Amino acid sequence: MIAVLVLASNAIAAEMRVMRGSTGETIRARLEGIDGDTITLRREDWKTFEIPLTRFAPDEQARIRADAEALTAAAAEINEATGHELVNLTPLDGREAAEIAEALAIPQESATSHGSSWRRYAARGGGNAFRLFGAMPYSTALYSDADGLVAHLSIVYANKGDFGSTAGSGEAHFGGGTSATRSTLAEAMNADAKTITEALTEAIGEPTTQRFGERQARRTVTRWDWHGHSFILSHEDGEYVGLAIMSTEAADGGGRTDRISNTEIRERLAAGVRRAENGDVWITDIPMVDQGPKGYCVPATFERVMRALGVEADMYLLAMIGETQAGGGTSVRRLIDNVSSHVRSKGRRPHEETIRQLRIRSVKRRIDEGIPVMWVMHSMPEYNKIANENTTARAQDTDTEARLKAMREQIDKLASGPEPVGNNHICMIVGYNEKTGELAVSDSWGARYELRWVPIEAAQWVSRDELFYILP
């Protein structure tokens, strides 16, 4: 294959090399693009710039053109294996994430001041024909940095949460289970891993192995490198098959991420608090993660909170750490215990609190600081009906008192009946209004559920009176 020959040849340097100018001066750089007689280079200080090809010696010009031609052919091989126009001469971390999202038809999931994300669930809406590297990804998630450049692409194939799941999405996921068995999951995972390995090996060449990730998420992975891109394949028995695509520099770091200072995080959190004249106080700038058609509310919600606090996280890895059951269902206590050391290593402090009764004062201090509060509750259909109706009504509020009276009449009927059972769930409390006696809640079910307002009495009816949060 062309790509294999390219990588085997010293004529093509995937990383930095010395280039000779027309007057004898040299520069160490990496070729990242060519447009006619203009090339794009990345220097060792990681800055990119454009320069006329004529600034180089004639033999160097010929070498650069040959490099560009061979790299373009290699990129075509990888894109054929991908099934989409994914790579070019510019490594992913130098490209706009929105461009990659468009190429892969991934809808935007979240946008914050410190990064954005896009996510596609291929199995939704009859999208089973979607393939990446020959296999169907259940989840394709793209993450950007604050400047909109690609941070990494995370593709999850057969896994214990999505494979065989009979659950719906959002409010409809409760009561769902899985048709998968240990045997059928293992068979699907092995098939996906084999297909992906063969596709990447044919396009790029033989892989290497390395240890990757931090603490409980540390694992042995298979790695392919091409021109500043690293393709990292994880195959964790009984858990998931995943492919992460990132820069070779990030891969060389073994998946470790930098620690952001507590001062910076506190400033970021405080800047995200909004206050309205009607008394609403709520937190913005929290990433959204859609848990999809499975019971991953705990790992999805923890991912959102951890990322808001500057700690990189992925719900599929958190599901493994938290020993989530097939199809979903995670012990909050187990996940807290298992993820605490990682959170502390980044300078953050996990905290839990058991309360006698949920009140606005239970969360007010944290909300004022910009810290989302994770709340364990029963997400009953009656509660969701009230949350949806109240949120819609208050958006066009002309008579707040009448609206709340109508809501509380529904709540009084519920409170006089049996206590809620089942539909165990965790979401976030992200706001309050002391004047109206309402809480703002955020579920990990996509944009529609990012901010809903519920009367405190409705929240009290479904509350299990356990709160969790992470402090800077």
Located regions from the model:
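Short coil-to-beta-strand transition motifs
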Residues: 20-28, 194, 417-428
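Noncatalytic regulatory segments and standalone regulatory/sensor domains
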Residues: 242-258, 262-281, 400-426, 430-472
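Predominantly the structural core of cysteine protease catalytic domains
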Residues: 329-426, 430-434
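Bacterial N-terminal signal peptides
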Residues: 1-8
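Amphipathic N-proximal alpha-helical interface segments
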Residues: 74-88, 102-192, 209-268
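Second-shell loop/turn segments in exported
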Residues: 50, 181-190, 283-294, 304-305, ...
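Active-site-adjacent structural segments surrounding the nucleophilic cysteine of cysteine proteases
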Residues: 77-93, 99-100, 107-109, 213, ...
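Compositionally biased alpha-helical segments
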Residues: 12-87
